[in-house]
A protein has these predicted regions:
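N-terminal pro-sequences and low-complexity stem/linker regions of secreted or lumenal proteins
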Residues: 1-111
């Protein structure tokens, strides 16, 4: 179970610098009442829940920044100063062209 995995990760000496993201890549149907932002032909799609577990996460905070599953890649790219992936640039440019903000990189949920 996920809870067992999280408990083991939290017991790790590396946990002080760890970010655990629990999410999934399927929304499960048409339940969401919020219309997805208009981007390119592939998305972003409907909202999906995510939980961030980390000593670096803001405690008791609900982040309303728009994210997609590629936001995890955005975070890794930003954190380690890697070149931006072309697909992320394409998606963000499509969102901006439609008057929407680019997707976030999870940093708003962190201290």
């Amino acid at each position: 179970h996920i809870a067992d995995l999280v408990t083991k990760l939290q017991a790790s000496p590396q946990y002080a610098n760890m970010l655990i993201v629990i999410t999934y890549d399927e929304f499960g149907g048409v339940w969401d009442h919020v219309v997805p932002p208009k981007g390119d032909k592939l998305g972003p799609g409907t909202r999906i829940p995510a939980i961030i577990i980390s000593p670096l996460a803001k405690s008791g905070y609900v982040d309303h920044t728009p994210y997609d599953t590629a936001s995890i890649l955005r975070f890794i790219t930003r954190r380690w100063s890697l070149p931006t992936l072309a697909g992320l640039t394409t998606r963000d440019n499509a969102l901006k062209a439609n008057g929407q903000p680019a997707m976030g990189d999870l940093s708003n949920a962190l201290q």
